[in-house]
Amino acid sequence: MAGLVKAKDYDWKDSNMELFGSSKDRQVKKESAMTEKCWEPVGRATSPFLMVWRVNQFTLEPVPSDEIGNFYNGDSYVICKATRSPGGDKLLYNVHFWIGKHSTADEYGTAAYKTVELDTFLDDAAVQHREVEGYESQLFKSYFDKLVILKVILKGGYASGFRHVKPDEYRPRLLRFCKEGKTTYMRQVAFSKQSVHSGDVFILDLGSRAYQFNGSKCSAFEKSSAAAFLQDLESKRNGRCNTSVLDEADTPQDVGVLHEFWTALPDVPVKELEPPKEVIKSLYKLSDSSGKLELTIVSEGSASKHDIKPDDVYIILTKEGLFVYIGKDCSVLEKRNALSNAHKFLQTCPNPFLPITVVTDEQAESFLKGIWDE
């Protein structure tokens, strides 16, 4: 088919996931999983790893190792992280799908479907997660020393990167470096003077010239991350890019404003991000005991482990994210519809972009620790 047309911001959140959960769906997933070439290295692995795939028109393609940690907001991705079990040789798997701000509903659906397919390939041993740009879970961010979020560079969202573009044809961009916990974010921000402030480090990339601006209140980690990026930029452009550093603290204001870092940026308004809305912790039950699948509220304001029964699926809404508990004795219908119902549930919530984590009874002990109100 022709290149996908990008939807407006986060239109994918209204997408339909009705295919999930049917008996045909499970059969198709299993058959597809056994023939998906992307899963072959996962099946062969005997030691911990981090693998990433990008959705390209309903299929996946591996992200090269030197690009892992770079995410384009016009795309969706599948991420598999394997760690060694404590005191054992068994591998533990976390499978995430990440949705860029400008990803289409088709790309989102493919990423979600492939995440469940990979879990099927691993005999349901993985913990499944949904991640949305700008709302990533702490677990997801912990995988990367540097997490890079870039805007779409070429029409259609399947970004090319600078190495395929002449320096003078490259679209100017403004990059922000910000440390959150142990991870340094590099995020492409609005191309405006009003995006720049003293608390972080910024790089103005003009193609043949690039400038690092160190805010007077930035951290040493942000400085070093930006410097490393700038050095890598020079290397990748084979000396075709001149770089320099502008320190706000050491530069007189009347001199600084004449620097190209400032003169090249337009002074246009920047849309402020809406602060997250208040989330009331709540517990819901997904059950087919009545003959049809129904989601009902169990409690609001708290979530007690004592309300959990092994023969149903439960959804726990918290400010950190949405957790889905798969009871060990739940029905096949309840289990297969857990992720799709979590997605539908969040569509009605004030914060529809919260991370989603789906855990089995066996996985719940570690992932739901600290969630319960006893």
Swiss-Prot record:
Keyword set, alphabetical order: Actin capping, Actin-binding, Calcium, Repeat
SMART domains for this protein: GEL (SM00262)
InterPro entries, per the entry: ADF-H/Gelsolin-like_dom_sf (IPR029006), Gelsolin-like_dom (IPR007123), Villin/Gelsolin (IPR007122)
Keyword Calcium: yes
Keyword Calcium listed: yes
Pfam family name, one: Gelsolin
GO CC, one annotated term: cytoplasm
Molecular function terms from GO: actin filament binding
Gelsolin-like repeat windows: 58-109, 180-220, 278-369
Domain of life where this protein originates: Eukaryota
GO terms under biological process: actin filament capping; actin polymerization or depolymerization
Task of the protein: Severin blocks the ends of F-actin and causes the fragmentation and depolymerization of actin filaments. This severin binds stably with actin both in a Ca(2+) dependent and a Ca(2+) independent manner.
Family, as annotated: Belongs to the villin/gelsolin family.
Extra information: Severin changes its conformation upon binding of Ca(2+) and then interacts with F-actin.
Name by which UniProt lists this protein: Severin
Organism field: Echinococcus granulosus
